[in-house]
């Protein structure tokens, strides 16, 4: 990877918002192959979401280029609360919850980065040992309150108020960078655009305590916005999680495959490891054959495989194809639950029932007359089979372990009927 210019690659991918010292960083990369860089994440939940992928993709690119990524889990800072991007005070979590979240996040990070040339550390290990007098004497005196007040993350909160606890967060994050630089030879911090002030505070602290010539760099990532101006990272159903129990591989795949033509190339550059020429070719396809959605399919494949592996991708594609073709009978019971989790649902008993009665009783049809008309016109499918016989009996035990009957009306209108009793 000696001839690979990672900074130019990051620029091409639209991954750099600000850098503290590009010339110094280039000089360091030219002379050293041991660059270590980090980003932090506080254990505010028990799963990562796709917003976390934004900094993690930068770390992963550096890892693939032979450098050493480090992730700091904020067991210490997480008990305080980062004010960045918030207009109100965070609700503090219990120590038990924080530790549970730390374990869950660690497992997900190892899945993304492996264990080779990658480290996870917890800032509880150094912040938790520091007493108040040490904090004030060794670090507090190096921070000017007027400078801290001018940081955007604090200034934006002054009108509505900010606690001393959250006000001090930037000092704790600066200490993180200093400790990592001093004890773990970490030279660079990356973060979102709103972390610029915290990152530069850490670099200033390193230079004050270790000397101005100590290598310390910072890089921030642009705010990821969709073409419609809204913030990237949410679906209509809320956050898109990396935990397959919270967001199934199928739902995850669907999030990416449904991206707008105006956004898909930007996301291919940022969230995949495809080469420039591959992405350029897909960009041409978007212009000439947008209806094929080849770029979206490739995006969904690459990101789903990265997060959920080949098995997760295969499951997502199997479910997607079954719903698209209408051939749902080969899905497993679990796959049906995943595929139709957000579809309209109804309940019915376990006994066999005439199709027309079944459709009316489950409120899929408003009347028997309408039900007969739709059946006769071939608009009704039971477990993937088109039924045009109004005397047909629905047997709930016939498929999906007797748990479900899938009714499709027309091309795409699915209802998942849960069988009770």
Swiss-Prot record:
A motif ('HIGH' region) lies at residues 43-52. InterPro entries: aa-tRNA-synth_I_CS, aa-tRNA-synth_Ic, Rossmann-like_a/b/a_fold, S4_RNA-bd_sf, SYY-like_C, Tyr-tRNA-ligase, Tyr-tRNA-ligase_bac-type, Tyr-tRNA-ligase_bac_1. GO terms for biological process: tyrosyl-tRNA aminoacylation. ATP binds at residue 234. It is found in: Cytoplasm. Catalyzes the attachment of tyrosine to tRNA(Tyr) in a two-step reaction: tyrosine is first activated by ATP to form Tyr-AMP and then transferred to the acceptor end of tRNA(Tyr). Homodimer. This is Tyrosine--tRNA ligase. It comes from Lactobacillus delbrueckii subsp. bulgaricus (strain ATCC 11842 / DSM 20081 / BCRC 10696 / JCM 1002 / NBRC 13953 / NCIMB 11778 / NCTC 12712 / WDCM 00102 / Lb 14). The gene is tyrS.
């Amino acid at each position: 990877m000696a001839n690979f210019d990672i900074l130019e690659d990051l620029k091409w991918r639209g991954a750099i918002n600000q850098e503290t010292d590009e010339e110094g960083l280039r000089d360091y990369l030219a002379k050293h192959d041991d660059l270590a860089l980090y980003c932090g994440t506080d254990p505010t939940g028990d799963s990562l979401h796709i917003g976390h992928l934004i900094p993690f993709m930068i770390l992963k690119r550096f890892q693939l280029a032979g450098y050493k990524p480090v992730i700091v889990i904020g067991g210490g800072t997480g008990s305080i609360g980062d004010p960045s991007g918030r207009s109100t005070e965070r609700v503090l979590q219990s120590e038990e919850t924080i530790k549970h979240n730390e374990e869950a996040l660690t497992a997900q990070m190892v899945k993304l980065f492996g264990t080779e040339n990658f480290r996870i550390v917890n800032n509880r290990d150094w912040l938790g040992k520091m007493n108040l007098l040490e904090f004030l004497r060794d670090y507090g005196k190096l921070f000017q309150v007027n400078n801290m007040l001018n940081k955007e993350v604090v200034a934006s909160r002054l009108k509505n108020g900010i606690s001393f606890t959250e006000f001090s967060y930037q000092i704790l994050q600066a200490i993180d960078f200093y400790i990592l630089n001093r004890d773990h030879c970490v030279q660079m911090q990356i973060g979102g655009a709103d972390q610029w002030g915290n990152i530069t505070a850490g670099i200033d602290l390193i230079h004050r305590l270790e000397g101005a010539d100590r290598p310390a760099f910072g890089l921030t990532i642009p705010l990821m916005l969709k073409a419609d101006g809204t913030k990237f990272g949410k679906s209509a159903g809320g956050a898109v999680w990396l935990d397959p129990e919270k967001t199934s591989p199928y739902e995850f795949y669907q999030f990416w495959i449904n991206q707008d033509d105006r956004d898909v190339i930007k996301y291919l550059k940022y969230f995949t490891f495809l080469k420039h020429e591959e992405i350029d070719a897909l960009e041409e396809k978007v212009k000439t054959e947008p209806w094929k959605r080849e770029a979206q399919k490739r995006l969904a494949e690459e990101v789903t495989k990265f997060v959920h592996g080949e098995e997760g991708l295969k499951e997502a594609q199997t479910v997607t194809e079954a719903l698209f073709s209408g051939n749902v009978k080969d899905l497993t019971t679990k796959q049906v639950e995943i595929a139709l989790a957000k579809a309209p649902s109804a309940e019915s008993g376990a006994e066999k029932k005439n199709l027309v009665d079944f459709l009316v009783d489950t409120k899929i049809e408003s009347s028997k007359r309408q039900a007969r008309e739709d059946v006769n016109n071939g608009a009704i499918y039971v477990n993937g089979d088109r039924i045009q016989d109004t005397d047909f009996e629905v047997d709930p035990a016939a498929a999906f372990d007797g748990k479900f009957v899938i009714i499709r009306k027309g091309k795409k209108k699915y209802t998942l009927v849960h069988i009770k009793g």
